Regions:
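Short, surface-exposed "cap/lid" segments of acyl-processing enzymes
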Residues: 23-64
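Alpha/beta-hydrolase active-site loop
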Residues: 77-97
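Gly/Ala-rich beta-loop-alpha elbow adjacent to hydrolase catalytic centers
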Residues: 107-115
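Acidic catalytic loop of the alpha/beta-hydrolase fold
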Residues: 157-161, 188
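Catalytic histidine neighborhood in serine/cysteine hydrolases
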Residues: 172-188
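Catalytic histidine-centered segment of alpha/beta-hydrolase-like enzymes
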Residues: 185-197
Length: 212
């Protein structure tokens, strides 16, 4: 498994990025979005790191990047609008680099809102993965309408997004879909970030878009 430091083109300037590459030929390309920038979220957040490593272990090539204004990425916080454009730029980069691979949209917290929303509307993306999605704070309208496979991982004791709200959101989603609840985990999965990786491996090791 190798990790390549990259700078990818963004809508208003370069975006700092890391490309995690598996051993052997990759089977899918994942674009992973980090949590809320104004609350300290970056592509190095523990859950993002653990998720990326888990996905590379099961054969995915994973692009994680810093939204505008984070780290060495150009620009400044844009209340989600510009961050959507950043994610689209990351999708364009991966589609150009890996044109023959399935593309999966994934993100943690605020990043799940960005990734799943863009992924639901982009025909190049065939799978939506959300970790601790803030469904009580953002509209996931496109995701609710989408028939693409959806995978959600959430903490049982999330203090910001109650599990009840996520279960209600999940009930509104079209099949195929799967929800994994991690016992005792809070919103940041403190002390349990590796369990997020374990959950993704269990959900996605044998998954391909063609099988759904």
């Amino acid at each position: 498994m190798s990790e390549t430091v990259r700078e990818i083109p963004g809508a208003i300037g370069p975006l700092e990025a890391l490309l995690d590459v598996p051993h052997g030929e990759p089977r899918a390309a994942v674009i992973f979005a980090h949590p809320l920038p104004i609350k300290g979220g970056t592509m190095h957040t523990k859950v993002v790191f653990q998720a990326a490593k888990a996905l590379t272990r099961i054969g995915c090539v994973v692009l994680r990047f810093n939204f505008r204004g984070v780290g060495r990425s150009a620009g400044s916080w844009d209340n989600g609008r510009g961050e959507m454009d950043d994610y689209r730029a990351a999708v364009d980069f991966m589609a150009g680099r890996y044109p023959d691979l399935e593309m999966w949209a994934a993100g943690f917290s605020f990043g799940s809102y960005i990734a799943m929303t863009v992924g639901a509307d982009d025909d190049r993306m065939c799978t939506l993965v959300g970790i601790a999605p803030p469904v009580n704070r953002y509209e996931y309208t496109s995701v609710k309408l989408s028939t693409k496979p959806k995978f959600i991982v959430h903490g049982e004791s999330d203090e910001l997004i109650p599990l009840k709200a996520v279960r209600e959101f999940y009930a509104q989603l079209h099949e195929p879909k799967e929800l994994v609840e991690i016992d005792r985990a809070n919103h940041l999965f403190d002390g349990q970030a590796s369990e997020v990786g374990d959950a993704l491996e269990e959900l996605l090791t044998d998954f391909t878009c063609e099988t759904r």
